[in-house]
């Protein structure tokens, strides 16, 4: 998340081209030509001993002779000289460098050198970067691009060149165009942090092949996507494609889960990528998902309608008033409906009247206008009419509009007009619908992430017991545990299993069956055969002693024939579960090499292919995220919504997934968990067969997770001055109702001191931003008092760190009727300790001069107090390093 050096890279004031040349085919010539042609305002310093000047600019023989230190250096020489040149740049004090090419064998040495000099690197094997707002073309691309609001980050030079060429033809603009190359140092997460705060960037498009740090990516993407739409195209979905790209990018469903968790939207192919660029460049934000379609032909509208239906889109319903106005304005033969077919003889006036009426209504959230080539209604004339109406109408600048002028040659001028007017335009009805549904899905993802999770009921977790059982098994040399051994671990987290007994032979199996009652199930117990069904190692509905004996002997015989070297540790004996009307599910936890643990949900009784048969999520899960996973499974037909007798208990299954998530988060020794089948019968969920793979784990248990979990270790009981005890803990997404109630008990004066303005009401979005935090980026502690089965919030303090983890902005607020109990000071002391322990250097805040209580508290805690009377504020700064020394 570091931003060190990015300003010098993306907004350099001076540039040195190392290896500048006058030979047209050389990289140094191409880079100089593009820098000068791009209109860069600062000094460009060619460095070459071969020429006294390059393209009319005085050259310098070596790096040491440069008259001053450049902000940015670009290595255009033979890769064999990279390390020596990087050393010279570091000695000169240069802080950023673009490396255009370097073999993999150099990577480690280059990175060590750069870190020694605190230099940032883009590349190697980077096409470079373009920043049109700075007049900067520090790339090989001769294609000039316009200034725009879309930033593009790519890990592929080929894709970068393709997009540049495509954008030039459409006169599409960018705020930044960055080719990462091998991402040896600067990576996509840092650029997302930078672009999220960049005023020239309103949307971001990513082309990704791999990640070096999944957790940093998810954290940065989630933060940026709260303010700006981000679309991702990820190649390497198949193992063959990963081999071709020479990447180990992890499971494709894991990417889907991470992209969704971060609030991004994934596009699947190059066609969708081009549509996405058009959409992000021009489309206005959506207010909802209701689409109105206008067309001058039934067939194109039908194609759009089919695509909308296949993607589960929603048509707008016109009100009676709107329908009446349209009937009065349009010819009688036109059927007033949605889609609205104006027929192939639709004139300019028909389009204008229709648009005027629709723009004045509140019946839709987005408007799609289709035009097919027609002699009676020329496309260019209709395009002019649409653009003029949108500009003239009072609501024109607020409507989300998509245009689809079909055809190629006859529609070129119309599409050019739309691009000039800043209106999104597409070549096909299906492509237009795809673009619309991209934004609908993005909006849904964002809304889903901001929903307040319900508090799960009766969640059980005995982490200490589970740890002890796992450590004991590992100490005994176990690497895999079966159902019988896993039972107490699952029970520690409230997960139900069938009682299971171990039988060494057929006689013992008969004895156990007689004790527990018939019918029973027998299952092979072997560490070498994880899938018992492969050797017919499961026998069900055994109703007599004779059946049990025969089944046991048959299992042993089949294993000896099919797998003679397998170790057989006897049989598992279970009472036969009542499967009548029940649904069999499967819950699996796998470890992905990029994203860590994944939770998968699918149907039981099938061969397991996660890419096709499961929905996937990243832990940790809360009830909201778990419910979303279940609903996605139903929508994608990965699980059924009901069995023969009962509807699926979505809440109950969501709670079970939360329990599985808690187990995985708390117990890093678990490498893989397979619950199959999980029997769902009405509101009961029972694990019939479970396999658990385990291994010793040494290190930070949170480091293996792509999303930082709730930090339980920061909880602390505190006694206030009046003797009451309250719990200091990190804030939770589930705290939103309690936070709203807390704010209602704070006076307007205290709220004014906190927020510097009068706030009548906090929206759900406001409260979601306060409670649904990324613990890697910010921390909020709440003081809560427990009353029976509920909690009330007494005070809140929070700190939001910058991406470099140097400074944090803090704030504190205590319930107005609880002042004088020392609560504010204790909360601040906890926040100071937390920020200091996490390596931050300074804690900063502001308040008002008449907030004397806060100013006095800050002084007591060691803050430097800077009263700025002209600004009407008081600056508060705490040097955490000095605080640590004291």
Task: Give the location of each predicted region.
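Short beta-strand element of the conserved SAM-dependent methyltransferase core
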Residues: 522, 573, 692, 783, ...
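A structural signal for short, well-ordered beta-strand segments
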Residues: 73, 675-677, 690-692, 810, ...
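Long, contiguous binding/interaction regions
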Residues: 698-886
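Catalytic-core regions of core metabolic enzymes
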Residues: 1-689, 697
């Amino acid at each position: 998340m570091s931003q060190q050096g990015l300003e010098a890279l993306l907004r350099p004031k001076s540039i040195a081209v190392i290896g500048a040349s006058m030979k047209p085919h050389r990289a140094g010539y191409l880079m100089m030509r593009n820098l000068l042609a791009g209109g860069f305002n600062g000094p460009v310093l060619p460095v070459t001993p071969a020429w006294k000047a390059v393209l009319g600019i005085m050259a310098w023989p070596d790096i040491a002779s440069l008259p001053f230190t450049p902000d940015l250096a670009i290595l255009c020489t033979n890769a064999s000289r990279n390390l020596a040149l990087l050393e010279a740049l570091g000695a000169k004090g240069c802080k950023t460098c673009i490396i255009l090419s370097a073999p993999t064998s150099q990577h480690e040495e280059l990175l060590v050198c750069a870190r020694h000099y605190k230099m940032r690197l883009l590349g190697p094997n980077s096409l470079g970067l373009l920043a049109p707002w700075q007049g900067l073309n520090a790339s090989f691309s001769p294609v000039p691009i316009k200034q725009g609001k879309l930033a593009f980050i790519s890990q592929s030079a080929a894709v970068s060149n393709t997009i540049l060429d495509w954008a030039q033809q459409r006169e599409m603009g960018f705020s930044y165009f960055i080719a990462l190359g091998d991402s040896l140092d600067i990576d996509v997460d840092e650029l997302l942090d930078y672009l999220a705060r960049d005023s020239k960037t309103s949307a971001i498009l990513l082309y990704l092949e791999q990640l070096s740090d999944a957790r940093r990516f998810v954290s940065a993407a989630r933060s940026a996507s709260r303010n700006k739409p981000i679309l991702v195209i990820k190649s390497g979905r198949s193992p063959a494609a990963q081999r071709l790209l020479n990447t180990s990018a992890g499971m494709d469903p894991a990417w889907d889960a991470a992209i969704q968790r971060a609030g991004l939207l994934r596009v699947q192919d190059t066609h969708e990528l081009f549509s996405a660029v058009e959409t992000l460049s021009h489309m206005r934000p959506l207010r909802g998902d209701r689409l109105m379609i206008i067309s001058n032909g039934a067939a194109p509208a039908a194609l759009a309608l089919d695509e909308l239906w296949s993607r589960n889109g929603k048509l707008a319903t016109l009100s009676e008033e709107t329908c009446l106005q349209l009937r009065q304005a349009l010819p009688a033969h036109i059927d007033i409906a949605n889609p609205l077919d104006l027929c192939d003889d639709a004139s300019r006036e028909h389009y204008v009247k229709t648009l005027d009426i629709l723009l004045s209504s509140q019946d839709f959230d987005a408007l799609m206008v289709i035009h097919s080539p027609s002699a009676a209604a020329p496309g260019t004339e209709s395009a002019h009419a649409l653009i003029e109406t949108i500009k003239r109408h009072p609501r024109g600048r607020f409507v989300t509009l998509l245009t689809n002028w079909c055809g190629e040659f006859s529609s070129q001028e119309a599409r050019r007009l739309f691009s000039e007017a800043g209106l999104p335009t597409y070549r096909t009805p299906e492509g237009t619908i795809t673009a619309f549904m991209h934004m609908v899905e993005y909006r849904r993802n964002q809304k889903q992430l901001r929903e307040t999770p319900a508090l799960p009921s009766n969640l059980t977790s005995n982490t200490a017991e589970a740890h002890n059982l796992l450590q004991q098994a590992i100490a005994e040399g176990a690497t895999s545990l079966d159902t019988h051994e896993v039972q107490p671990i699952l029970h520690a987290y409230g997960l139900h299993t069938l009682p299971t007994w171990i039988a060494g032979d057929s006689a013992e199996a008969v004895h156990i069956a007689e004790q527990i009652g018939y019918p029973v199930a027998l299952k092979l117990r072997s560490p070498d055969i994880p899938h018992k069904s492969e050797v017919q190692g499961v026998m069900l509905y055994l109703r007599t002693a004779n059946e049990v004996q025969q089944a046991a002997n048959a299992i042993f015989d089949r294993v000896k024939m099919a797998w003679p070297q397998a170790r057989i540790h006897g049989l598992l004996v279970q009472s036969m579960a009542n499967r009548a009307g029940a649904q069999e599910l499967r819950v699996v936890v796998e470890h992905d090499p990029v994203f860590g643990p994944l939770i998968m949900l699918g149907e039981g009784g099938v061969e397991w292919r996660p890419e096709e048969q499961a929905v996937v999520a990243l832990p940790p899960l809360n009830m909201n995220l778990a419910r979303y996973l279940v609903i996605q499974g139903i929508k994608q037909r990965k699980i059924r919504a009901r069995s023969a007798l009962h509807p699926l208990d979505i809440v109950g299954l969501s709670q079970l997934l939360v329990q599985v998530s808690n187990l995985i988060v708390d117990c890093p020794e678990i490498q893989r968990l397979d619950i199959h089948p999980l029997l769902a019968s009405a509101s009961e969920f029972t694990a019939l067969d479970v396999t658990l793979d385990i291994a010793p784990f040494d290190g930070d248990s949170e480091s293996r997770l792509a999303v930082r979990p709730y930090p339980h270790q920061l909880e602390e009981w505190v006694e206030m001055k009046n003797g009451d005890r309250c719990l200091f803990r990190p804030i939770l997404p589930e705290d939103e109702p309690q936070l709203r109630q807390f704010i209602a008990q704070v006076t307007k004066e205290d709220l004014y001191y906190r927020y510097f303005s009068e706030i009548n009401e906090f929206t759900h979005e406001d409260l979601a931003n306060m409670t649904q935090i990324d613990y890697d980026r910010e921390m909020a502690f709440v003081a809560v008092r427990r009353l029976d089965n509920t909690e009330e919030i007494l005070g809140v303090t929070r700190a939001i760190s910058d991406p470099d983890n140097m400074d944090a902005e803090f704030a504190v607020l205590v319930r107005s009727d609880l002042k004088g109990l020392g609560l504010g000071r204790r909360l601040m002391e906890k926040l100071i300790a937390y920020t200091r322990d996490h390596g931050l250097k300074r804690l900063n805040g502001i308040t008002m001069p008449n907030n004397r209580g806060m100013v006095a508290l800050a002084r007591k805690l060691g803050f430097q107090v800077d009263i700025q009377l002209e600004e009407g504020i008081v600056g508060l700064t705490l040097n955490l390093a000095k605080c640590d020394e004291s």
